[in-house]
């Protein structure tokens, strides 16, 4: 379970998150709805350890991530799939290399196993035979599906989607 308690975050003295409490359980769908600029992305990035918070606590399976070092947070991140708003694909990597990227960071699979897993995930999002193309060569919708394939390649316990 991921739990936020009293989370506050400011940028340049402008409070973006004010006393946020939330619980996210594996297998459950949660929506965070708000106006543009209301802090949805900041909350997501805080929940996965990409943003520090000013006040409050964020727990992952009852472990306080707000006091963890980068290595400890990295160990947790392999259980979190994230699709960022812009997709965050690497333009210099092929579709296949983009999807394999988390496997290269977090997996001890062989290169053949990584390729098979990445192609399996591409097929899950209905992207067949595009693995050798580059992000500039595919449509915006296809880029979003590549980002989803990359987010699920590690079989995460949680999948966060920012503006899916």
Sequence positions of predicted segments:
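A short, proline-enriched helix->beta-strand linker immediately N-terminal to the Walker B motif
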Residues: 153-157, 163
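Helix-to-loop junction immediately C-terminal to a conserved catalytic motif
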Residues: 48
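Hydrophobic anchor residue at the start of the ABC signature
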Residues: 148
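Conserved ABC ATPase signature
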Residues: 134-138, 142
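Conserved ABC transporter NBD signature motif
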Residues: 56-64, 76
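Short coil-to-helix segment of the ABC ATPase nucleotide-binding domain corresponding to the Q-loop/switch region
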Residues: 93-101
């Amino acid at each position: 379970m991921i739990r936020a308690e009293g989370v506050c975050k400011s940028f340049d003295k402008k409070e973006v998150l004010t006393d946020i409490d939330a619980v996210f359980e594996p297998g459950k769908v949660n929506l965070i709805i708000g106006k543009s600029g209301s802090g949805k992305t900041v909350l997501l990035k805080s929940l996965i350890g990409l943003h520090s918070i000013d006040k409050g606590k964020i727990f992952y399976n009852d472990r306080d991530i707000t006091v963890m070092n980068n290595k400890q947070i990295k160990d947790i991140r392999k259980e979190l799939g994230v699709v960022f708003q812009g997709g965050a694909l690497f333009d210099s990597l092929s579709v296949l290399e983009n999807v394999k990227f988390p496997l290269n960071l977090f997996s001890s699979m062989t290169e053949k196993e990584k390729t098979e897993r990445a192609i399996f995930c591409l097929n899950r999002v209905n992207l067949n035979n595009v693995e050798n193309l580059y992000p500039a060569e595919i449509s915006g919708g296809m880029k979003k599906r590549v980002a989803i394939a990359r987010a699920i390649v590690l079989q995460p316990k949680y999948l966060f989607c920012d503006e899916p």
